[in-house]
Amino acid sequence: MLYQLVVLAQNTLNESDFMIKDFGIINGNPWLIVKGKAGGSTPQNASLVYAYDFVTDNGTYVVMSHAYEDTDEVENDTQWHTHRLTLDNKNCIVNINDNGDTEVNNDLVKVTNVITRNVSKVFTAELELNNATSSTCVTKVFDSAP
């Protein structure tokens, strides 16, 4: 009898996938290390966004996964991809563009093909798309450093 093993995407949030162990910059590319599996959790709710955020001297870069289409960088936007964005004082996205590429491997999240000199802060977060106001805002910060 032939058995086939099927591996499904993780359907539950594992917060260790967003707990920051270390962060820095190599050759102008910001990176962070998590305690769990980088990119191991992806949102199952169409209005949610999971994000690894890098605040740099050249803007804020965000490696994110979500169910709605907003980039040509990846075929399916639940795949981790990078945007450069601006948040307002309510932590809502006011400007977003495709800038930078993404490397997610084991416990590492890295933004590539950008030039930054320093990373002043990193944080991991959940954002939510509000269809009524057409806004996407941070609803939960999982972890931050420093």
Name these PLM-found stretches.
Residues 36-38, 88, 117:
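Beta-strand elements of well-folded, non-transmembrane domains
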Residues 29-33, 110-112, 126:
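Beta-strand secondary-structure signal
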Residues 88-107, 112:
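Short helix-loop boundary/capping segments
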Residues 1-11:
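N-terminal low-complexity, Pro/Thr/Ser-rich intrinsically disordered segments
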Residues 118-146:
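Acidic/polar low-complexity flexible segments
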Residues 12-84:
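Surface-exposed, glycine/proline- and aromatic-rich loop segments on solvent-exposed faces
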Residues 81-83, 87, 113-116:
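Short, solvent-exposed, Trp/other aromatic-anchored flexible loops in extracytoplasmic proteins
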Residues 55-57, 101-103, 108, 117-119:
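Surface-exposed, acidic/Ser/Thr-rich flexible loop segments
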